[in-house]
A protein has these predicted regions:
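Glycine-rich FAD pyrophosphate-binding loop
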Residues: 26-45
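Active-site lid/adjacent beta-loop-alpha segment flanking the redox-cofactor pocket in flavoenzymes
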Residues: 45, 233-319
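Dinucleotide-binding Rossmann-like beta1-alpha1 core, especially the glycine-rich loop
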Residues: 50-128, 134, 282
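Central helical "cap/lid" subdomain
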Residues: 189-241, 272-273, 289
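Beta1/beta-strand and adjacent pyrophosphate-binding region of the FAD-binding site
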Residues: 3-15
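Helix-loop-beta segment of a Rossmann-like dinucleotide-binding subdomain
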Residues: 57-58, 86-96, 119-162, 260-266, ...
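Helical element adjacent to the flavin cofactor pocket in flavoenzyme catalytic cores
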Residues: 138-193, 197-200, 205
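C-terminal catalytic lobe of FAD-dependent flavoproteins
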Residues: 293-369
């Protein structure tokens, strides 16, 4: 087994949450290792990157969690960009949510935070929007990060420059527990060899695959299919967030179109005709002109979902094993605050009252009652 010290951290999972947590520890002089089976399959590489606390219609503790994280993100991204030398595409571009009638608008959980848009206003904000949309809400403070092309690469580089050790192709077969304390993991490497890697403390952040590592974690995959189209630069300046489809414009005119919600897909890979057709119908319903723009890519991924669609963050009942998973649709939005709270928790640093309340609300124990 490999040697370890009290300032060593083992991260199980190399997706966005794992990288975010690894980054904050490495930046504070910890020796960090990341175990990842296939990092490019993580949700962080396939998500649209929206920062949509208000436009998602989040409620209660999820809304507060999103608000807190959105406040942290500018400084967090600034540090990542400085350490990596890679610009991450953070844009407070605003998000428009369209409605067909006022009844639906008034039922929207966060409508009081948005600016009301008449149909004329909608057409001004979203050039070419379908005339079926009569009203809208503009959430000007919501925005996006270009996670797929920039943020993930920037985090990987920043982690590497801070000494993080990556073990790609490392599939965790089992956790090694002694006297209810984690001391390591049994890992099948890319060449088929079974090794034991020990640790002082570990953080499990394996997204949709978390249950395969620790069965008591009730996380399941919800597949999402996406595609991108190339529009004219600056044609779409706001994100357009419809009821079943969203259009996320990057600064070069590329538009991310998402996403299907396939609850019974398990880990079935690949795009399907039905999935692509659903996305195309969504484009047509929101921005008909975009149906004539060239399609660039299509891909899929697996959101880590819990029974109540809220993340699991905090201590496990195994000493020195911490959990950060189940972020479902909001991994990009929640990454900054998750990494911050986990760092404080692992270090026994003081937490604010609202951080303590988040840990209570998002504890694994809520599923054991």
């Amino acid at each position: 087994m490999t040697e370890h010290t009290k300032n060593s951290i083992l991260i199980i999972g190399g997706g966005l949450i794992g990288l975010s947590i690894a980054y904050v520890f490495a930046r504070n002089d910890f020796k960090v290792s990341i175990l990842s089976k296939k990092r490019n399959e993580s949700a962080g590489f396939v998500a649209a990157g929206m920062l949509a606390t208000h436009a998602e219609g989040l409620e209660d503790e999820l809304f507060k969690f999103g608000q807190q994280s959105q406040r942290l993100i500018p400084e967090w991204i600034k540090n990542i960009e400085q350490d990596s030398g890679i610009e991450c595409g953070l844009r407070e571009c605003g998000i428009v949510v369209p409605f067909k009638n006022m009844k639906d608008l008034r039922k929207f959980p966060t409508y009081k935070y948005g600016k009301y848009l008449s149909q004329k206003d909608l057409q001004t904000e979203i050039n070419g929007i379908n005339s079926i949309w009569k009203h809208g809400l503009l959430f000007a403070e919501d925005g996006q990060i270009d996670n797929r092309r920039r943020l993930m690469r920037a985090l990987e580089r920043a982690c590497s420059l801070h000494g993080v050790k990556f073990q790609e192709g490392a599939e965790v077969q089992d956790l090694i527990i002694e006297r209810n304390k984690i001391i390591g993991a049994k890992v099948l490497n890319a060449t088929g060899e079974l090794n034991e890697i020990n640790c002082f403390k570990a953080i499990l952040c394996s997204g949709a695959w978390s249950k395969k590592i620790l069965n008591k974690i009730p996380v399941s995959p919800i597949k999402g299919q996406m595609l991108s189209i190339q529009g004219p630069a600056n044609f779409l300046k706001r994100i357009l967030f419809g009821p079943n489809t969203y259009l996320v414009p990057r600064d070069d005119g590329l538009i991310i179109v998402g996403a299907t919600v396939e609850k019974d897909s398990k880990f079935n890979q690949g795009n399907t005709p039905n999935g692509i057709n659903q996305l195309q119908n969504g484009i047509r319903s929101l921005l008909p002109e975009a149906m004539n723009w060239p399609q660039m890519e299509h891909w899929w991924g697996f959101r880590p979902s819990t029974p109540d669609f809220k993340p699991i963050i905090g201590k496990s009942d195994i000493k020195n094993l911490f959990i950060a998973t189940g972020h479902y649709r909001n991994g990009v939005l929640f990454s900054a605050i998750t990494s911050d709270i986990i760092y404080k928790l692992v270090q026994d640093k003081s937490l604010t009252d609202i951080e303590i309340s988040f840990l209570e609300k998002f504890s694994l124990k809520r599923f054991e009652m």
